[in-house]
């Protein structure tokens, strides 16, 4: 996800 790029 853009806000949580560690999660994708």
From Swiss-Prot:
Residues where Glycine amide occurs? Answer: 8
A GO cellular component annotated for this chain's UniProt record is: extracellular region
Does the keyword Secreted feature in the UniProt annotation? yes
A Gene Ontology biological process annotation? Answer: neuropeptide signaling pathway
Q: Which UniProt keywords apply?
A: Amidation, Neuropeptide, Secreted
Q: Any coiled-coil ranges, and where? A: none
Indicate where this protein is primarily found.
secreted
- What biological function has been recorded for the protein in this entry? This cephalomyotropic peptide stimulates contractile activity of cockroach protodeum (hindgut).
* Name the record gives this protein: Leucokinin-7
């Amino acid at each position: 996800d853009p806000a949580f790029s560690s999660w994708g």
